[in-house]
Every structure is written in C-alpha cells, then in structure tokens.
Amino acid sequence: MDPGTLRNRLRGIVDPRGKGQVNSTSLPADPATVPGDELAPGHSTGSRTGSTLEHVLGGEWRSRDQGRSFVVRRRIDPDTAYGRTRVGEFGSRLSEAQDGASLLATGGPRGPFLFFDLETTGLSGGAGTHAFLVGCAWFDADGAFLTEQHLMTDYGAERGMLSVVAEDLAQAGALVTFNGKSFDAPVIETRYLFHRLSSPCSQIPHVDVLHPARRFWGADPVLGCSLVALERQLLGARRVGDVPGFEIPARYFQFVRTGDAQPLADVFEHNRLDLLSLAGLTARLLALVTTGPASTHDEREALALGRVYERAGDPRAEAAYERAIELADAALQRGGQKRRNEADWMSTPQGVRIEALRALALTLRRARRFGDAAVRWRQLVDFPNCPQQIRRESTEALAIHHEHRERDLAAAKMFALKSLEVGPETAWGDAVRHRLARIERKLKVSERPLFPSSPSQPSCGSPTSGHRTSS
C-alpha cells in the first residue's frame, strides 16, 4: 500500500466528525496505538454522549465533589430463571451459608456480599490499564439481584467515577470476585492511588472464588476454568450472542472516539451476566462448605472440601477425606479410572483416592492417631500405580511408625528396604541407609541374651558345682 493511500485511510478512521468509522473488530486494543486525535485524558465528551448514553443504556448521572459518574442500575427479579436455578435461590443460599465465607478467605468476611467485576482497557494490568466499567451487585431484602454499573465516559471522568464506586464498596461486608486478587483489585487500587484517593478495596475482606473453584471443579479441557465454563457446568446457564472478551476494549475506544454508546450495550450485558454467574457460583461454594461432606456430589468435590477444612483447621476435614475415598472407590468399581491425559490423571477417581488417602494419613498423624494413620499409609503402599514419590513417603512413614511406636524392628527394616527400592537416589537413599544401620544395631542388641552364662561358672545343679552328693 502506498503512503498516500495509507494516510487517507488513517484520516478516515480518526475523523472527529465520524466519517469513515470502522467496525469495532478492526479497532486496535490499545488507545496508545490509535493515530490522530484520540481524546486525551481530561477531554470530556460532554453533551455529545449524554443523550446517547441515557437513551441506549438507560442510566443516570451522579455528581459528587470529585466529579460526576454515569451509573446504570438494574433489578433482576427473584423469580427470574438463570440456568437451572431462580435468582432468588442464589440469595437465599448466600444468606443461609454466609458464615462459610470465613473458610474461603481471611479477614472475617461476612454479609452483605458485594459482587465486583471490571471491564478494562487492557488485559495485562499495570499503571496504563483503566477500568472503564465497574460492575457492583448485591441481593436486596426481597431476594432481587441489584446491579450498579459505573461507566468512565472519558479519561477525565475517572476520578468522579471512582468516588461514586467507593460509596458502593463502603457498604460491603465482603468483596467477592473471580480472579479479583490477581487482576480486578490491583487494577482498581492502582487507579485510586493514581488520583491520590484512599482505596476502599484494601479495607474489605476479599473472597476470590476462582481458586476454590479450581480445586472443587477443575478446568474444562476446552474452556479451562473460566467463569463462562463454570456457569455452564454448574449453573446450566448458556449465553447467547455474548460479546467476546477480547473485543470489549475496542468497543470502549470506539465509544470514546465517536460518542456512540450502542457498542457498549452488549458490554454492559456481558458484565451483568458475569456478576450474576459470580453470585450463583459463590452460593454453590458457600452451601457446599457449610453443609459438609455429605453434600458433595463426587470424589473431587469431597477432596477439595477436605483441603478447605484442613486449611481452616476445621475438624470436618477427616470426614471429607473419608467421603472422597468412598466416592472414589465407587467410581473405580464403575470403571471410572480412564483419563484424558497424564496431566489430568490426578483428577481421575484413582488419582483422587490416592490424594485423599495421603491427606487423611497426614491429618491423622497430626492428631497423634498414629495407628489409624499407619493403616492409610499401608493402603497407599499396596495401591497399584501409586506415584513413586507418594509410595516412597508412605514406606518411610511406616518404617518410622514401626521403629519408634510399634517397636517392631523387623517390620521397620522391611519398610525401610522397600523405601530404598522405591528411591535409591543420593539424598533420599542416604537417609534410608542411615535408618537401616540404626535398625540393624537395635536388632543385634535385641538378639543378645539378657543374662549370658559365664564359661568359668558352671550352672547351678551340675555335678561339679562343689556340693557332695549323698551316697
């Protein structure tokens, strides 16, 4: 393409009068890459966007000392179906199980829960990333789901938007996000810091449901552990016509450049669905950790629940691990040992059974129930296809148990030798050989007679004992 043609095309893209607009999918994903007269920070779109925003999105302006913000408020009725569940049921579960939040996060999270999700100008985070749409949601007393979405109408409106968002955050007993500890919270805190405003996020207990969701339900082989994948799997919800995440920044840049809010309508709907799915997923998690092991549907859920309890010091961890073993055994009897690939192996019933046995043995040992722990270690040693590292750990634990607690040196020697067979490498092998040498010394001592007879002293009652016999 010759320079003249390229120059004309670029002028068409950035024409402030709206000529030569391009499709949103062809827009660059970063405003810094747009040539021409992109709106600079502090340049307000003013009345050019006001009527369009209110007409397309149906929101309102809120003015504060720091500036004003455009807010779109929606109410989703409790009887509205979302996937297999009604919205009001999410609120009821959260209300009944809110104490379970303390098992998933530190800082004493409590209700009311504020569900929080950002749409940003980039996916990399950092100081140059702006949160142009801040979604906040909660359940009201009637079980309806309320959403407030705050739009940064241009870069100069960010300070006003942040001041209004802070009012929502100040009312929260806990902040609930999906990957928010790694992305949403750092992004919004950076923007508060940039404007020299106090960040309310740092003062609120934060429940990030991504990490427990990974433990409980794993990753879909195609969709991974995204919110969309989990809402399909757990809530039965499917989105129709949803805007792809990679396209969202480009739609915002088009709005800033042209003042046309129509491309943002789908972005707002995408954000609302994210908030609703986040609420449904949180309700499912809290109900699970509150009701206990009996409510788990499969061995993976039970194992993850045991780890949540163990991390929180909850005594129900033992029952959860027992439940995981029970469900894994049932799945193995049904022929559920197949796996998609090696990385996925520990998610199979066989892999979960091994992990649950190991976790249970460690839990019992910490409770000083050494005999019960030894039973679980022995089950691991005898289990076919047990990973080498876990088998080695189990044989070593059994050698220690029989040497120091059962005082069965022969059994201790046997398990030490088994441990050496599993892992003879230098670091491990040296420790095992040291243990074997000690056991051998103890065995030699135990084989000596307690009161050995002296050759110079005949035994009592012999003819040469010095006593005459009567004739």
Predicted regions and their residues:
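N-terminal accessory regions of nucleic-acid-interacting proteins
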Residues: 1-110, 305
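Conserved DEDDh/DEDDy metal-dependent 3′-5′ exonuclease domain
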Residues: 142-234
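Acidic, Mg2+-coordinating catalytic module of metal-dependent nucleases/exonucleases
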Residues: 222, 226-296
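Residue at a conserved register position within TPR or TPR-like alpha-solenoid repeats
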Residues: 309, 364, 402-403, 440
